[in-house]
């Protein structure tokens, strides 16, 4: 049985592949044979628009829907060229159930999102995703990028794309453990929450900047320096941080 932390890492790894929302598909590569199969397996996929999308996809694109993404990982999906990308149907004691049945199998189901745990299922009628931490959810949806993607948990944070969910709970097919404390290190990608940075680790004059996605490039005398972490915005980030910042002013991405 996967731990919630392993489960989330495997889900996040799917975003590195080409994916497409295909109803009833749990990680199959969209080969010619699979395109033939999945354009006929469900009314949703039979619409001219979806047929065109599926047929246009390259053979190294993997098909998922919201519940099938979760089942695929729990069934051992590996991103291979085998029939189901390495997943074994109904393996590991995980049944083939839909989104609405999946939330019914969960424990600790609640509509209060203030203390949601990494790896919990998030649900709204007919749709599911998984909370991955830092106010983010991984889901497969035809909205936005039309595949597996990371979105903002709109119940507790703002971001784009964003969605508000109804309920969340712990899946019975995942072992939930406490997350190990994170020790920031050089090279880590973080979300900077502050609005200022400094020219040196002990500078007294702050300069305005915009927070956002950044990389830790240096750590100077932690526990002694006023601003021990040096951050530089990542390529494509809206952040403007490029300087020294305080401990506790950022979170792991």
Per-range role (PLM):
Residues 1-82, 125-127, 138-140, 146:
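N-terminal capping segments
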Residues 2-10, 59, 71, 79-154, ...:
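...with weaker cross-activation on analogous glycine-rich loops/strands in unrelated enzymes
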Residues 73-81, 194-196, 221-225, 229-234:
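Short capping motifs at secondary-structure boundaries
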Residues 118, 125-127, 133, 210-215, ...:
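Residues that flank catalytic or metal-binding motifs in active/ligand-binding sites
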Residues 168-173, 234-253:
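Intrinsically disordered, low-complexity, charged/polar segments
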Residues 181-221:
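Beta-loop motif signature
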Residues 206-243:
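Basic/aromatic-rich interaction segments and small domains that mediate binding to polyanionic partners
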């Amino acid at each position: 049985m996967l731990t919630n932390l392993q489960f989330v890492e495997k889900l996040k790894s799917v975003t590195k592949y080409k994916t497409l929302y295909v109803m009833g598909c749990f990680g199959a590569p969209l080969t010619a044979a699979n395109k033939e199969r999945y354009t006929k397996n469900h009314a949703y996929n039979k619409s001219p628009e979806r047929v065109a999308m599926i047929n246009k996809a390259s053979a190294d694109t993997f098909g998922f829907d919201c519940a099938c993404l979760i089942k695929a990982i729990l069934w051992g999906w590996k991103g291979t060229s085998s029939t189901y990308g390495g997943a074994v149907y109904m393996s590991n004691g995980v049944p083939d159930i839909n989104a609405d049945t999946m939330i019914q199998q969960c424990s600790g189901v609640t509509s209060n999102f203030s203390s949601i745990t990494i790896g919990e299922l998030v649900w709204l009628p007919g749709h599911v995703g998984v909370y991955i931490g830092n106010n983010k959810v991984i889901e497969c949806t035809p909205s936005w990028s039309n595949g597996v993607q990371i979105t903002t948990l709109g119940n507790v944070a703002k971001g784009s794309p964003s969605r508000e969910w109804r309920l969340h709970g712990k899946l019975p097919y995942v072992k939930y453990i406490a997350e190990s404390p994170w020790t920031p290190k050089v090279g880590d990608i973080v979300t900077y929450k502050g609005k200022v940075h400094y020219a040196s680790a002990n500078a007294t004059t702050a300069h305005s900047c915009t927070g956002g996605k950044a990389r830790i490039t240096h750590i100077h005398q932690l526990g002694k320096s006023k601003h021990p972490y040096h951050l530089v915005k990542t390529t494509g980030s809206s952040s403007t941080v490029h300087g020294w910042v305080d401990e506790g002013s950022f979170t792991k991405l």
